[in-house]
């Protein structure tokens, strides 16, 4: 809050390893302090790329994921993530879509509970 975001450092729709690798290279060139991944599959690829480049986590760059699945639970260092109820998120999204298709007014924003699980990758 209050921080400005450098939009040139936002890499959206990086859904294959070539795009992820390119985004990691660009983030490192631009001296990114942290790489925040949209899911654990992307985060796994980011971690592999960083290891191949001998980049130390969190000393050289911090890494976090928006999803707290079992995919990364054995990673060293442990990965900071968001913990939330994916089932509840899906139900709310589904209800919102149904309401929209029925012409009902929907909230612009729905906030659901979450927890930031701080681990070694961002210390």
Question: Predicted regions span which residues?
Answer:
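Bacterial carbohydrate/catabolite-sensing allosteric modules
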Residues: 1-123
């Amino acid at each position: 809050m209050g921080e400005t975001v450098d939009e040139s450092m936002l890499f959206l729709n990086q859904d294959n390893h070539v795009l992820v690798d390119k985004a990691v290279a660009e983030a490192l060139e631009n001296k990114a302090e942290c790489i925040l991944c949209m899911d654990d599959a992307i985060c796994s690829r980011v971690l592999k790329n960083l290891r191949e480049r001998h980049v130390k986590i969190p000393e050289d760059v911090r890494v976090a994921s928006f999803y707290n699945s079992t995919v990364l639970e054995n990673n060293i260092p442990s990965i900071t993530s968001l913990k939330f109820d994916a089932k509840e998120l899906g139900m709310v999204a589904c209800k919102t879509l149904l309401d929209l298709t029925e012409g009902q007014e929907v909230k612009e924003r729905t906030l659901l509970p979450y927890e930031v699980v701080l681990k070694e990758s961002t210390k």
